Amino acid sequence: MKKNNYKIVSLYSFFSFQENSIIELKQNLLRIEKENDLSGLLIIASEGINGTICAEEKIIENILNLIKNIVGNNQLNIKVSYSKEKIFKKLKLKIKNEIVTMGVPEINPLEDAGTYIDSFNWNKLIKDKDTIVIDTRNHYEVSIGSFKKSINPNTKNFSEFPQWVDNNLDNHLGNENSKNIAMFCTGGIRCEKATTLLKNKGYKNIFHLKGGILKYLEDISKEESLFEGECFVFDKRVALDHELKKGSYSICHACGMPISIEDQTKVEYIEGIQCHFCINKFTDEDRKRFEERQKQINKLKVKNQEISNN
């Protein structure tokens, strides 16, 4: 495949997804995967669709047309990037209760989400002294990049966010209930639910970054950007820089934490087995399993390199 010939589309939409349409889409996607070089991860639920797909441009367009026919008049939020190689091993389709798991089934982003702020007006909003900025992502995502002076809820997963709101948000607001609350995430989907949650709890002046960090990095020049670091993504690229190209981070295959080039020079780091985040987390038996897995990965790398050289 030629340079940057993989088109990557991150997408989501909230809409009433009927069971027969879910089954039909799943069958069509599996058929396309069987006949083409398609990979990705799509999560499907009765509330909509969420995920990322990776393939040649014409295949991507065919899939988007399928999805748009189902979504109908509801907005399909899309972010596009490109890669020299596949960012997933294969296509995974998951049918779940929620397309992004918050664990608060009564909220509906279609009815009561916050106010969108586009990339070009975001800087002005978060610079306002009467605005607090909340990063709704998980702690390991925040650790490698975020907007200046944003609040880190330090959650392990998104389902912890409602409890953080109950325990902490009023402390950040103080007695100033008129403050703006600006929220952001990777692509926008978590903020659809996070802003709806806050509005349902009676908070006012709730805003969220339309298209998330990915759209902001696409729209705003590096010189004007208030985003610092890299943006974590849930695929082989691990993180993206301001040009939406693969960044400098890798993943520790033992604990799943993003690790920098500097982290990989630390004495605690052994590729595929441990890093400084997890050195005390696993048993010797675990590490033996990780070591064997890494041996198999290395063998596969050598084999693939030999094939590409021939």
Curated annotation (Swiss-Prot):
Domain Rhodanese: 127-225
A GO MF label: oxidoreductase activity, acting on paired donors, with incorporation or reduction of molecular oxygen
Keyword entries, A-Z: Oxidoreductase, tRNA processing
An individual GO BP term: tRNA modification
Family annotation (SMART domains): RHOD (SM00450)
Active site: 185 (cysteine persulfide intermediate)
Pfam family, one: Rhodanese
Disulfide bonds: none
E.C. no: 1.14.-.-
InterPro entries, per database record: Rhodanese-like_dom, Rhodanese-like_dom_sf, TrhO, TRHO_N
The reaction(s) this protein catalyses: uridine(34) in tRNA + AH2 + O2 = 5-hydroxyuridine(34) in tRNA + A + H2O
Family: Belongs to the TrhO family.
Protein function: Catalyzes oxygen-dependent 5-hydroxyuridine (ho5U) modification at position 34 in tRNAs.
Name of the protein: tRNA uridine(34) hydroxylase
UniProt source species: Prochlorococcus marinus (strain MIT 9515)
Name of encoding gene: trhO
